[in-house]
Amino acid sequence: MQENKIYIPEEDPYFARPYIDVEEWRDTPLRHLYVHGGFEGTKKDGTEVKFCFYFPEKEKYEGRFYQYVSPAPEDEHESEHLTGEDDKISFALTHGAYYVVTNQGGFSLTDGERLFKSSANGAQFGRKTAQRIYGYEHRPFGYIFGGSGGSFKTMSCMEMTKGIWDGGVPYVLANPMATPNVFSPRVRVMRVLGEEGLKKIVDNMEP
């Protein structure tokens, strides 16, 4: 069995040319410094590796970042339309952290390593950007998270690298209980008790 080699971003010339094309203060959803960019020479199947960083004001920064990986590679702006409990940007900004998201390099059926390499290089360049923005040398603590398909990506990022993230939270992992047939008990309750009966159960179960 071939042993997996730990990936070290600093040794990969493929990601050696990061760039920033937007850096501006924004007031929505909360005041933050927005940074957008990518890595030159990383285009594959028409998609270049790109990233977005969202930095809180200096007095609110506590030396950490949160990085989200979605179930499927999407636009690096994907978190900007989220609201309420799903608003990951606001959560990071109000918890002393800057927020990191990449487009994961886009969809690729032939390069399974592109995801964790894109995520790792996004995280590391985010650290360098944080040092520049906040004006002092430090290593921001990093935490990566993702649900459903993103849970596997979170584990991949943690397992295939070392020293990039200090913790990871994979959630709603796919397993036998996550298959569609587990919805059948709910449907049976609705069939036997009717829609009103199901509403009563939900009402009693909610806090």
Report each predicted region and the residues it spans.
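Catalytic-loop region of hydrolases
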Residues: 1-63, 86
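Cap/lid segment of the alpha/beta-hydrolase catalytic domain
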Residues: 62, 67-135
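Generic beta-strand/beta-sheet core signal
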Residues: 69-70, 102, 145-147, 170-171
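Short, structured coil segments at secondary-structure junctions
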Residues: 95, 161-164
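Alpha/beta-hydrolase fold nucleophile elbow
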Residues: 136-148
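Short glycine-enriched nucleophile-adjacent loop
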Residues: 151-162
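A catalytic-pocket lid/entrance helix-loop region that shapes and gates access to the active site
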Residues: 165-207
